[in-house]
UniProtKB/Swiss-Prot annotation:
<dbReference type="GO" id="GO:0008716">
    <property type="term" value="F:D-alanine-D-alanine ligase activity"/>
</dbReference>
<dbReference type="GO" id="GO:0005737">
    <property type="term" value="C:cytoplasm"/>
</dbReference>
<protein>
    <recommendedName>
        <fullName>D-alanine--D-alanine ligase</fullName>
        <ecNumber>6.3.2.4</ecNumber>
    </recommendedName>
</protein>
<keyword id="KW-0547">Nucleotide-binding</keyword>
<keyword id="KW-0963">Cytoplasm</keyword>
<dbReference type="GO" id="GO:0009252">
    <property type="term" value="P:peptidoglycan biosynthetic process"/>
</dbReference>
<keyword id="KW-0961">Cell wall biogenesis/degradation</keyword>
<keyword id="KW-0573">Peptidoglycan synthesis</keyword>
<feature type="domain" description="ATP-grasp">
    <location>
        <begin position="104"/>
        <end position="300"/>
    </location>
</feature>
<dbReference type="InterPro" id="IPR011761">
    <property type="entry name" value="ATP-grasp"/>
</dbReference>
<comment type="function">
    <text>Cell wall formation.</text>
</comment>
<keyword id="KW-0067">ATP-binding</keyword>
<dbReference type="GO" id="GO:0046872">
    <property type="term" value="F:metal ion binding"/>
</dbReference>
<comment type="pathway">
    <text>Cell wall biogenesis; peptidoglycan biosynthesis.</text>
</comment>
<dbReference type="Pfam" id="PF07478">
    <property type="entry name" value="Dala_Dala_lig_C"/>
</dbReference>
<comment type="similarity">
    <text>Belongs to the D-alanine--D-alanine ligase family.</text>
</comment>
<keyword id="KW-0479">Metal-binding</keyword>
Length: 306
């Protein structure tokens, strides 16, 4: 089917805590898809998504959603039921990758190095140290570093935020060994890893503001690493992508502890940010692929039974 006759529904927005990020990704992808010659309909997702899609009658769905409902297998399941080819990973891979504990079980079975962890409730994590400090507390099913808390060495007690009135990230958490070192990320497109980017920030860690605020972080591509570490990170990202059963584009994040020469995988994002300056498009551009071409690749890669 020619591009100018292929109807593409770009879905974005939704109601998760990552809605602002999704709006940015989706609108940028829609603009790129139009520039590439596709017939594009933009859909700001509501709980009536099935009706929204039925009205749009797309040939392909380009998924620009982030966070719960959009990247945890829920929307993917709806698209499978409706028989609409869609981008990125399928139901099972999306659900596994979104659950930090389940994805780490997959990593372990694949032979990847992961940080020690423990599943805890919010009440348990608030009552006493879940692990010996330093450690990190993460919601099991959130993205964009929402709800991530670092407990430093010497901390007198667990994070006070867990008992505060503004906590909205659920009652099931993962306490994880804190891995010092350099923040690395690797994008995978289909069956190939693209490059290794090092992320530096003046903040305590790569949090929401570091990820999305102007000047919040600096991306070094390619990362200045020993060749063996670069190769190991790219191999590990591709292995994680395959072990989870992912399709399309993913981005895996790592910590590299130079003192111990230890490369630890943190997570795999099945719906990575998709603005022209996001990490995956940056790596694609580094490899000679424009943002427009990247979006077109995702559209042409779309399918059901992913």
């Amino acid at each position: 089917m020619k591009r100018d006759t292929k109807r593409v529904a770009v879905i974005y927005g939704g109601w998760s805590s990552e809605r602002p990020v999704s709006l940015s990704s989706g609108q940028q992808m829609a603009a790129a898809a139009r520039k590439a010659g596709y017939d594009v309909t933009e859909i700001d997702v509501t709980r009536e998504l099935a009706s929204q899609l039925a009205e749009a009658e797309p040939d392909v769905v380009l998924n620009g959603l982030h966070g719960p409902w959009g990247e945890d297998g829920c929307v993917q399941g709806l698209l499978e039921v409706m028989g609409l080819p869609y981008s990125h990973s399928g139901v099972l891979a999306s659900a596994l990758a979104m659950d930090k504990l389940k994805s780490k079980a997959v990593y372990r079975s694949a032979g990847l190095d992961v940080a020690a962890d423990k599943r805890v409730t919010r009440a348990e994590a608030a009552a006493a140290h879940a692990l010996p400090p330093p450690y990190v507390v993460k919601p099991v099913n959130e993205g964009s570093s929402f709800g991530v808390l670092i407990v430093r060495e010497g901390a007198n007690g667990p994070p006070h935020e867990l008992t505060g009135p503004n906590w909205r990230y659920g009652d099931y958490l993962m306490a994880e060994e804190y891995i010092p070192g350099r923040e690395l990320t690797v994008a995978v497109l289909g069956d190939r890893a693209l490059a290794v980017t090092e992320i530096t920030t003046l903040r305590d860690y790569y949090d929401f503001d570091a990820k999305y605020a102007a000047g919040g972080s600096r991306h070094v591509i390619p990362a200045d690493l020993p060749a063996k570490v670069t190769e190991a990170a790219m191999d590990a990202a591709l292995l994680a992508h395959r072990a989870l059963g992912c399709r399309g584009a993913t981005r895996s994040d790592f910590r590299y502890d130079e003192q111990k020469d230890r490369l630890v995988i943190l997570e795999t994002n099945t719906q990575p940010g998709m603005t022209p300056t996001s990490l995956v498009p940056e790596q694609a551009a580094h490899m000679g692929m424009s943002f427009e071409d990247l979006v077109a690749w995702m559209i042409e890669d779309a399918s059901c039974q992913r």
